[in-house]
Amino acid sequence: FLPLILGKLVKGLL
């Protein structure tokens, strides 16, 4: 998993 995708997922959840 790329950091960009992970960040997007975290932002989407939050």
Curated annotation (Swiss-Prot):
Residues the record lists as Leucine amide modifications = 14
| One GO cellular component term | extracellular region
Its domain of life reads Eukaryota
Which coarse location class applies to the principal site listed for this UniProt protein? secreted
* Subcellular localization(s) per the UniProt record: Secreted
Molecular function as annotated in GO:
toxin activity
Q: Which pairs of positions does the record mark as disulfide bonds?
A: none
Keywords (alphabetical) are: Amidation, Chemotaxis, G-protein coupled receptor impairing toxin, Mast cell degranulation, Secreted, Toxin
Q: Which body tissues produce this protein?
A: Expressed by the venom gland.
Q: Which GO terms describe its biological process?
A: chemotaxis
- Name the job this protein performs: Mast cell degranulating peptide. Induces the chemotaxis of neutrophils. Its mast cell degranulation activity may be related to the activation of G-protein coupled receptors in mast cells as well as interaction with other proteins located in cell endosomal membranes in the mast cells.
**Family (UniProt):** Belongs to the MCD family. Crabrolin subfamily.
- The name of this protein is Histamine-releasing peptide 2
- This protein's species is Vespa orientalis (Oriental hornet)
